Amino acid sequence: MAHLLLLHGPNLNLLGTREPEVYGRTTLAQIDAALVDRAQAAGHALDCLQSNAEHVLVERIHAAREDGTAYILINPAAFTHTSLALRDALLGVGLPFVEIHLSNPHAREPFRHHSYLSDKADGVICGFGADSYRLALEAVIARLECDA
């Protein structure tokens, strides 16, 4: 059994009501519940955390190195384009991670095209709405099974 960590960045607590034409109508609670269930069905544990504060996400990433986390799934949201702190935290703990986005940042405004995480992530899944999370988890589960 692997311990997985799912991190959600700023404004994702508003999913379901914030710009549903871009982000869909699925709530964050629905996404988390579905992923926890799927992880458990595959024999893994999944912890979820959403924060609008960069330092909270950084501190949780730091804690992941000590708590047995095997893999991080992260939707950094707006921090994708601005946060060297998240990049450095992820590199500092040395855990594999996958970057997730509900929308396709490359099909949006030019300032959303750059990610400070993508070049260090094992993979990036974007543009499939709430299914982006499910697809990312399936990829992580497959990776863990290959490594077992």
UniProtKB/Swiss-Prot annotation:
CDD domains: DHQase_II. GO terms for biological process: amino acid biosynthetic process; aromatic amino acid family biosynthetic process; chorismate biosynthetic process; quinate catabolic process. One of its GO terms (molecular function) is 3-dehydroquinate dehydratase activity. The keyword Lyase applies. The keyword Lyase applies. InterPro entries: DHquinase_II, DHquinase_II_CS, DHquinase_II_sf. The record marks R18 as: Transition state stabilizer. It catalyses: 3-dehydroquinate = 3-dehydroshikimate + H2O. It holds the Pfam family DHquinase_II. PROSITE patterns: DEHYDROQUINASE_II (PS01029). Gene3D superfamilies: Dehydroquinase, class II (3.40.50.9100). Transmembrane segments: none annotated. Substrate binds at N75, H81, D88, L102, S103, R112. The active site is at Y23 (proton acceptor), H101 (proton donor). Pathway: Metabolic intermediate biosynthesis; chorismate biosynthesis; chorismate from D-erythrose 4-phosphate and phosphoenolpyruvate: step 3/7. Keywords: Amino-acid biosynthesis, Aromatic amino acid biosynthesis, Lyase. Homododecamer. Belongs to the type-II 3-dehydroquinase family. Catalyzes a trans-dehydration via an enolate intermediate. This is 3-dehydroquinate dehydratase. It comes from Xanthomonas oryzae pv. oryzae (strain PXO99A).
